[in-house]
Design a protein with these regions (language model features):
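Non-catalytic accessory segments of DNA primases and related replication-initiation nucleases
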Residues: 1-62
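Helix N-cap/coil-helix junction residues
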Residues: 14, 66-67, 137
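Serine endopeptidase catalytic core focused on the charge-relay Asp
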Residues: 58-71, 94
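Acidic beta-strand-to-loop metal/phosphate-binding motif
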Residues: 139, 183-191
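Phosphate-handling DNA/RNA-contact segment within nucleic-acid enzymes
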Residues: 84-179
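Short, basic/aromatic recognition patches
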Residues: 67-84
Length: 191
């Protein structure tokens, strides 16, 4: 037999036919029962604890990522961006009532490995976004891509709607379109 069959024969001390059945997921001619995933309760959402200032976030976004100060200040003032106690950028996503429902964190460390993640319990449909007044929606994978785009194309940026999917989910885009049916032009600005 092959390597796997020989291994099963030796490890389980089975004859060849039974080793093959075991590898096929059967025992004594019956299918083995598939293990059920452990039931886990969904985690409740909580924003990361903010730090007392935003020096590292501003330094990182302005000097390392070259985002315009006006753009960073706008999102900070709107309470959509802040620095957590671990000095990460926290990008906040709000629901229709203005309540935080999503947070994406990204390290400000420019050396070594980059750390980014969505906070447990985040509602993926409420990712980091900005609603505008015109009919266009710009879609990005990451919040920093969104901020970079605004920096590169500043003309009329406050009129446009933007959403960062904070990954690859389509849910944030569908939610923006549901919330604002007048949006009729979607620009996919994806890597």
């Amino acid at each position: 037999g092959g390597y796997a069959i020989s291994f099963v024969q030796r490890y389980y001390r089975l004859p060849y036919p039974e080793a093959v059945l075991l590898l096929l997921g059967r025992k004594d001619g019956r299918a083995l029962e598939q293990a059920k995933p452990a039931a886990t309760e969904p985690k409740s959402f909580a924003l990361p604890q903010p730090y007392s200032n935003m020096r590292r976030v501003y330094a990182y976004l302005l000097h390392k990522r070259h985002i315009e100060r006006e753009v960073v200040s706008y999102f900070t003032h709107e309470k959509l961006l802040y620095e957590d106690k671990h000095h990460n950028c926290v990008f906040v996503g709000l629901d229709d009532s203005g309540e935080a429902k999503h947070a994406h964190i990204r390290s400000t460390n420019s050396e070594g490995r980059v750390f980014r993640m969505n906070i447990e319990g985040s509602a993926s449909e409420h990712c980091f976004h900005k609603n505008g007044t015109d009919k266009s929606l710009y879609v990005f994978e990451a919040p920093i891509d969104l901020l970079s785009h605004i920096t590169l194309y500043p003309y009329g940026w406050q009129e446009h709607s933007y959403v960062a999917c904070c990954g690859t989910s389509i849910q944030p885009v569908l939610e923006r379109l549901r919330q604002n049916p007048k949006l009729d032009m979607v620009y996919l600005c994806l890597d």
